[in-house]
């Protein structure tokens, strides 16, 4: 047993220049841990609360001094003297101290930073890597990365309503090679955009945020019958993969999408593509049935292996229909739908509303609750995708967690911005440490799809 001796929280900045919480934690026998909380732009309505100050005179109301004070004045006194290796116990102390379902009193940003700092300190004291401390000797599976190379939606000032278009190097033999393939494809995409006269500025997660004016000029803007912005993006990805010299498909690189459809869903229960409407000057909206048909069309025409939040978090029946329609050949990932909350994941499993869960630690607020969410997901035969948020820092904890949980997939941005690259570099270190024991499943990571049986 090693007791927690000191906890200090402070306000620092994330990748958007927005405040977040950093926590340092020390133990009596020299253990030390540090962690920072991430922050999302498009958030599910059932996420744990990210406590902000609301003082418009500081950071436009986005300061986190309240959350910092809660750590220093309330959480720290409650945890000093607690066994740092009792992760479940110390998380329960914070949960009880908060007393609300969605961490509305203390704030999930402060609680998560404490929870992760404690895990880092425990691993430090035992002189083992974090992935080994949490996952034990079985932690040796490197995740297939989902690299967000085209940004849209809330993550970028681009022409695309869907939020993320990602490449997945499923045919690579190792994680190291997977990153090389991805980097070369990213550079090929940049070259293509440049040649077409489009911008190569990047969004919050390091992917490009094109305007597609070159494509709009060639078709009927009023109908988009030729190509929708999503199809233009998908065509570009296929072209970039080929230009980089790789195969398109399971022996090379496949595509994943995050539609972030909760952001498109309005009171009329239709999905409104506001960016298309801005270009055309006309309403562009889908019913649930039309949205499912549109997604199925994309899957039929492009090498798409994963769709996240294809429908709104309020459209549970639609998710069931979508999973029934294409869930045997495509990973249907619930993000806003489940918010890493075991209660909602359990409901999703019972309804067959998806076949995969996105894991975002700050949606639930503690490491032990995250473990519960992943365990529940995997026991159901679903896949788990460990994920960053659009507001990140140099903290690379999720890289260790992806390996610790043998998750098989990680979603942590593109091949630019050091807040994203930090996670990939950490995974390269882990792969090197594991040596011949390192496993990279590639396409086999989609073990629950019929195409792999």
UniProtKB/Swiss-Prot annotation:
Keywords: Cytoplasm, Glycolysis, Lyase, Magnesium, Metal-binding, Secreted. (2R)-2-phosphoglycerate binds at residues 163, 360, 389-390, 411. Pathway: Carbohydrate degradation; glycolysis; pyruvate from D-glyceraldehyde 3-phosphate: step 4/5. The active site is at 205 (proton donor), 360 (proton acceptor). Mg(2+) binds at residues 258, 308, 335. Binds a second Mg(2+) ion via substrate during catalysis. It comes from the Bacteria. It catalyses: (2R)-2-phosphoglycerate = phosphoenolpyruvate + H2O. CDD domains: enolase (cd03313). This is Enolase. It comes from Mesoplasma florum (strain ATCC 33453 / NBRC 100688 / NCTC 11704 / L1) (Acholeplasma florum).
């Amino acid at each position: 047993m090693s007791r927690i001796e000191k906890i200090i929280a402070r306000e620092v900045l994330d990748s958007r220049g927005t405040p977040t919480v950093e926590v340092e934690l020390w133990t009596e026998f020299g253990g030390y841990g540090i962690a920072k909380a991430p922050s999302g732009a498009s958030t599910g309505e059932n996420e744990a609360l990210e406590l902000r100050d609301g003082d418009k005179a500081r950071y436009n109301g986005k300061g986190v001094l309240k959350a910092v004070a809660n750590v220093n004045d309330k959480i720290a006194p409650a945890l000093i003297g607690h066994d740092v290796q009792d992760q479940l116990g110390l998380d329960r102390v914070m949960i009880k101290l908060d007393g609300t379902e969605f961490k509305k009193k203390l704030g999930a940003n402060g609680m998560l930073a404490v929870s992760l700092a404690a895990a880092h300190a425990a691993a430090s004291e035992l002189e083992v890597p974090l992935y080994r401390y949490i996952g034990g000797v079985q932690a040796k599976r490197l995740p297939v990365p989902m690299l967000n190379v085209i940004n849209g939606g809330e993550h970028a000032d681009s022409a695309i309503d869907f939020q993320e278009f990602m490449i997945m190097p499923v045919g690579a033999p190792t994680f190291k090679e997977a990153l090389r393939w991805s980097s070369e494809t990213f550079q090929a995409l940049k070259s293509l955009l440049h040649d077409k006269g489009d911008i190569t500025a990047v969004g919050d997660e390091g992917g490009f945020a094109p305007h597609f004016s070159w494509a709009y000029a060639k078709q009927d803007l009023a109908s988009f019958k030729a190509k929708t912005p999503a199809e233009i993006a998908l065509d570009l990805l296929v072209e970039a993969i080929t230009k980089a010299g790789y195969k398109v498909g399971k022996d090379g690189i496949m595509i994943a999408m995050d539609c972030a459809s909760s952001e498109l869903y309005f009171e009329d229960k239709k999905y409104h593509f506001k960016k298309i409407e801005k270009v055309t000057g006309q309403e562009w909206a889908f019913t649930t049935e039309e949205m499912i048909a549109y997604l199925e069309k994309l899957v039929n025409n492009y090498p798409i292996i994963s769709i996240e939040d294809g429908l709104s978090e309020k459209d549970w029946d639609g998710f069931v229909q979508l999973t029934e329609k294409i869930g045997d050949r495509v990973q249907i990932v619930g993000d806003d739908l489940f918010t890493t909350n075991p209660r909602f994941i359990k409901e999703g499993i019972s309804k067959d509303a998806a076949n995969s869960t996105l894991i975002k630690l700050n949606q639930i607020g503690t490491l032990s609750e995250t473990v519960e969410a992943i365990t529940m997901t995997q026991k159901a035969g679903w896949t788990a995708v460990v994920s960053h948020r659009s507001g990140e820092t140099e903290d690379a904890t999720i890289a260790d967690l992806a390996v610790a949980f043998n998750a098989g997939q990680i979603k942590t941005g593109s091949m630019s911005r050091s807040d994203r690259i930090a996670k990939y570099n950490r995974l390269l270190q882990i792969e090197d440490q594991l040596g011949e024991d390192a496993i990279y499943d590639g396409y086999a990571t989609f073990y629950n799809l019929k195409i792999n049986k």
